[in-house]
């Protein structure tokens, strides 16, 4: 049975509208005249999922994505298919989260609906009528972003959006918040961490298991987090060199960790530095200027390998990347791993693309068999 812990947040915040921009607003560049060359190099597939993508999650052995309705495919499958979920109810799914085999789909202002593979019913979660978004936390929990009513809303927090979080913390568009030691309550009371120097608006957040990263217009900030989730003594930051940043994700491959920063034209990459000696337990050292790359394709182990850089530049590198989704390989079904470390097995990489003409808007994936980017 699927019984995730679902929380409501006491801090009044509203719908994640900034993440649901029309694709025509994501970029204004004119890319006409280049696509014949692209098609000669790699045959671009017709999209399985039409239109802009607002979320992608893994639940059990399946992937789920939304363009307003729910779609699914097998983890190692090729084609996406629509799920008979909320059909005929005139409901638009704005965000997704997952816990075990359950998918939680938020219809902004209406509520959160739970879907489990193989079911046909649409079960609305209790006490979610004012949900504005559902967010997947780095520790596996699912958190709801809720407006608590007009009488509780103030101008200062009317545009605050929940972005992410993990053990002992939440990240919103206006700050980093620490949570009380007990997580059993339905409504969370949070305290803003004044040591976080990131200036609002915060655009996205990500976690690599040890550190939490926060994206702003010009910089990425890092908060060191040990296993107990205690407060760090330092923050560090670095300029990311990405124009008009939109998304942030952690990508691990062959024992190395990278931050991927989606922007107006493709995405940049920051290799996470490894602390030496005992310093890793007491100081924040992952972000260094020499490891910042304005675009991917600069090395063998990065998310787009160096040998695939040209094909990346002629496709993903020309369009806005508004979402980055890193999916760990499923190695339980007889697939042989290259190493006993999960960080050595290259994960699958998907991006949500926005093309000004909408011709190439949609979900794209890096194909490790051909080492090329192509549309899903």
Curated annotation (Swiss-Prot):
Record keywords: Cell membrane, Lipoprotein, Membrane, Palmitate, Signal
Lipid attachment site numbers (S-diacylglycerol cysteine): 29
Lipid-anchored residues (N-palmitoyl cysteine): 29
Main subcellular location of this protein, as a coarse class: membrane
Location(s), subcellular: Cell membrane
Signal sequence coordinates: 1-28
GO cellular component terms, A-Z: plasma membrane
Keyword Lipoprotein applies: yes
Protein's membrane topology: Lipid-anchor
Recorded family membership: Belongs to the TP013X lipoprotein family.
Name this polypeptide is given: Uncharacterized lipoprotein TP_0134
Originating organism: Treponema pallidum (strain Nichols)
